[in-house]
Regions:
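A detector of single, family-specific signature residues
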Residues: 1-389
Length: 389
């Protein structure tokens, strides 16, 4: 029998309309008494649940990180009276055939009582607010990319091949031509002549790309809708950039961490804010850089059999932080003679592009940890041969 380590605890199974709460109370070597109750997710009922836990002198409570359903419960319980843990649902699955809401609450309480919960990271309120802003920005950037793709598809459908000539259809030259295409009387020569700077060298090719197009009023409406929505999204992204910058500057810990993160090659201002919003500014929760990399998902998992190490896929980790660091790694590999570029170029022949890029993101994660943990800006290694040990 596994000895209990917590004598008064609660397991909470959260849902959209109801929560089931199981309180376990008993000495470490004794069989605990159990009480299970159901509450609605209305604030009044959540306060009653909180009072019930107080009456039972619960010192710890745990719930699964199910969507955003845990947040209202956490808001009520997070008053400093008890330790509230958040558990990864993949780590606390109940036995097959035994899954009900009440049983899940009992199972969570049992795991917590015996110290078998690996708590998920819950950042402080300021970091959570920054996370809301940076994640919202990422979502809007994705929406903007979708609108650009819709415009590109319409152009392909009507035989307008601007994308084969211009490196960026949504650069200054491309936008000038898209605007001109909204006028039925505009000729290919007139549209092509709107190219600016280096794109003017491509005017003969642009005329050919526009010749014989099949643009109708229907297609113009589709493009106009996408372009209007794209303009709105870009305004929102600009406003979010301002709000993110102000939020970081307002909170000292976030501001210091952001400045330290920007000392790592490839991590710029917005990316620094986004990654700090995921990891938090305090690295004491991670014992070393490898733990941070495992949490983010930039290091390979273990796959050892018969004493031999085989290729291990990276862990799932935090998809938001992982995506940011992979993007930063790609940027860092293009900075001439940077530590990241040398590391990537050394690995690419053996691992190919994607695994080498993930490995470079792992390198950036270790550099980020070093800067945040020591409180000193990261200084690049000038050696040609690098390791991530």
């Amino acid at each position: 029998m596994i000895a209990a380590v917590i004598e008064r605890c609660a397991g909470i199974d959260v849902g959209r309309k109801f929560i089931d709460v199981c309180v376990m109370v008993g000495e470490a070597q004794a069989e605990p008494t159990q009480q299970t109750r159901r509450f609605s997710t209305l604030n009044e009922d959540l306060e009653r649940m909180h009072q019930w836990l107080r009456e039972n002198h619960c010192t710890h409570a745990v719930m699964e990180s199910t969507g955003s359903y845990w947040r209202p419960v956490h808001n009520i319980l997070d008053d400093g009276e008890m330790e509230v843990l958040l558990a990864n649902s993949q780590h606390v699955k109940n036995l097959r055939g035994h899954k009900t809401d009440r049983n899940d609450a009992r199972w969570l309480a049992h795991l917590l009582r015996h110290g078998m919960i690996r708590p998920s990271f819950i950042p402080d309120r300021e970091t959570r607010e920054l996370r809301d802003l940076t994640r919202r920005r990422k979502q809007l950037v994705g929406c903007a990319a979708d609108e650009r793709n819709r415009v590109q598809r319409v152009l392909q459908e009507v035989n307008v091949q601007l994308g084969t000539v211009l490196s960026d259809v949504f650069g200054e030259s491309g936008l000038n031509m898209l605007d001109a295409l909204m006028y039925p009387d505009a000729t290919p020569a007139e549209i092509a002549d709107l190219a600016v700077r280096q794109a003017r060298k491509k005017i003969p090719l642009l005329k050919k790309a526009l010749q014989g197009h099949r643009m109708t009023d229907h297609h113009r409406r589709l493009i106009r809708h996408s372009m209007e929505h794209l303009a709105f999204l870009e305004e929102e992204i600009t406003e979010l950039d301002r709000e993110i910058s102000e939020h970081v500057k307002t909170h000292t810990a976030l501001h210091v961490a952001s400045q330290l993160a920007q000392s790592v090659t490839g991590i710029k201002q917005i990316a620094a804010a986004a990654v700090i919003a995921e990891t938090g500014p305090d690295m004491t929760q991670f014992s070393n850089g490898g733990k941070l990399a495992a949490w983010i998902g930039t290091c390979p998992g273990n796959n050892i059999s018969g004493g031999k190490r085989k290729g291990g896929q990276t862990r799932k980790g935090n998809p938001w932080a992982r995506r940011i660091l992979v993007e930063c790694a790609w940027s860092a590999t293009r900075k001439k003679d940077s530590e990241a570029q040398r590391y990537y170029e050394r690995l690419k022949p053996r691992l190919k592009h994607k695994p080498a890029l993930i490995a470079t993101a792992h390198l950036l994660t270790l550099q980020l940890y070093k800067a945040l943990a020591t409180g000193n800006p990261y200084t690049e290694n000038t050696q040609t041969e690098l390791t991530t040990a």
